[in-house]
């Protein structure tokens, strides 16, 4: 009744209530705005953190790919591998067809199982290829690359000129080939190659396999194809040289075993010597004008 009877007090109380309500409403609005801003900043921070994490993940993947690329070094080594493979493969073809190892495989395949003769000859040639490639990689560590490249150039030129000289002097290639086949056949019939090494390992390998292995190994040791393989490995990719030489030996020996003496007698040694001489001279020119870096 007092408030109703006194209008002034009633107006004052209403004014105070209105002010308090306004202030509390403004406080709630401010709190809501602050809450929204904090949530927005939290989302922004989370988004930035996710972006940063993604960037770190991408950078890690890129680094891993880069490290893998550096380890593999495919772009840098692929051309040298194929170049060495082609060089060694072509070199073996022109030096081994009609050679003593070729004739040994051909004559033995006429009297013994072809698979055994082929496996023994290829085993010896693969071992010789690995040894020759290893020697070619060891020599540059003992002698400077410049001197090894010069020696390879001289060897290529020597073999090229020698093969061209053989081609020039070959007046009757068929008779010479027949004579060489008769000489090799005499060696086989005389039992040459029966050494203590053969007797030691004869208990582990068949006599035919061992005979093919030893005769091929001894005939290939010091041959021009072995020396050329060593020379190639001094300045070309060793893996490519080994693979190319192995493929070349496989092709030549397989032809010898399958074709036998007929194939050996039909091949013109003058043609083979001419092609081989030109190929070795090409190796010499390439080694001289384009030395390894």
From Swiss-Prot:
One of its GO terms (molecular function) is metal ion transmembrane transporter activity. It comes from the Eukaryota. The chain crosses the membrane at residues 89-109, 115-135, 148-168, 200-220, 238-258, 272-292. Keywords: Membrane, Signal, Transmembrane, Transmembrane helix. It is found in: Membrane. The keyword Nucleotide-binding does not apply. It is a multi-pass membrane protein. InterPro entries: GDT1-like (IPR001727), MFS_trans_sf (IPR036259). Residues 1-25 form the signal peptide. SUPFAM superfamilies: MFS general substrate transporter. One of its GO terms (cellular component) is Golgi apparatus. It holds the Pfam family GDT1. Belongs to the GDT1 family. PANTHER family: GDT1-LIKE PROTEIN 3 (PTHR12608:SF9), TRANSMEMBRANE PROTEIN HTP-1 RELATED (PTHR12608). This is GDT1-like protein 3. It comes from Arabidopsis thaliana.
